[in-house]
Amino acid sequence: MAPQPLRGLVPFLLWCLSLFLSLPGPVWLQPSPPPHSAPRAEPHPCHTCRALVDSFNKGLERTIRDNFGGGNTAWEEEKLSKYKDSETRLVEVLEGVCSKSDFECHRLLELSEELVEAWWFHRQQEAPDLFQWLCSDSLKLCCPSGTFGPSCLPCPGGTERPCGGYGQCEGEGTRGGSGHCDCQAGYGGEACGQCGLGYFEAERNSSHLVCSACFGPCARCTGPEESHCLQCRKGWALHHLKCVDIDECGTEQATCGAAQFCVNTEGSYECRDCAKACLGCMGAGPGRCKKCSRGYQQVGSKCLDVDECETVVCPGENEQCENTEGSYRCVCAEGFRQEDGICVKEQIPESAGFFAEMTEDEMVVLQQMFFGVIICALATLAAKGDLVFTAIFIGAVAAMTGYWLSERSDRVLEGFIKGR
């Protein structure tokens, strides 16, 4: 069937016009929601309880400061005695204890509000420390200072100076943790009561320990000088009261691979890869090879690349050789490409225009799109009340409609003549 270039074009133009005449107002894009951040680790319940009590105590100070301090001392003392333990003050304090975004605080306050009220009205005198009464004794979320774990066991070094004052007792003050002492640099032992590796006792008494660093590679020493070494760190050896570096590369301690060589460093060693030209080596570069790798040959004291392309290694028709480091490759000569293992001549197509490869139907679609865009643009300008463009638009629609009708008439006449 012959192509029908403008079939359906008039309905398309009418739809285009109605679309532009009924354009809605601007559509505002809503900002996309922020990406979900990684969940944060929840704080230990004891830390939440401590923060709640700290905020409660600040609220007590705030309510006194905001409600009194006007200068009339007698009146303030009379009113303060009534306000101090009143329900009004408690409500004011509790309202400001948790920030709006602190979910953990709000959850804990909801669970413990009755306990706080009981302490406020009945237990303040016998238990003035709200933290101890609420967090440790009642809710059992915390332990006294210097203790840890479900049973509030003493930290190493005792409750008065956990970890000797030179470390942190894991879980101290909470119902969790292992009680292990994380000692400061230079200190060691179960309760951080000793000097660690590489440090010596510079000062010690019944309550005080000062650990200072040994000289460089010393592991144990009696003082800061090099001659004070008693034991050396790994990779060093004590020689005439001094620590000297051990050359592991000359011993069985160095365990490098067959394609590596050993390099001594201070207190240790490292293995580095041999050069590509080497099949085993004693050092860096092609001049330290034990044997040459395939594709290399001994030239003097070095292993150098063999140029395989100097001999006929690419016998295929229209092939040429390219030398590479330690090898070679066969490629097709310029103007040829590889196909099924052989080099065939490339067929360079003659230059063709943009429309040369388009089918007739594709040309029809492109034609319709072009005319549609022009008419839609004219319709938009005409819809804005521009008389000139309105006239042009009406004329264009009329011309296109006439063309479409004439094409249709031609097809009807052609069918009649052919006896359709």
Curated annotation (Swiss-Prot):
Location of the protein in the cell: Membrane
Keyword Cell wall biogenesis/degradation (UniProt): no
Gene Ontology MF, one: calcium ion binding
FU repeat residue numbers: 208-255, 268-315
Pfam entry (one): DUF3456
Highest taxon above the source species: Eukaryota
Disulfide bridges in this chain: 46-49, 155-169, 163-181, 183-192, 278-281, 309-321, 314-330, 332-343
EC number: 5.3.4.1
Signal peptide bounds: 1-29
Protein name: Protein disulfide isomerase Creld1
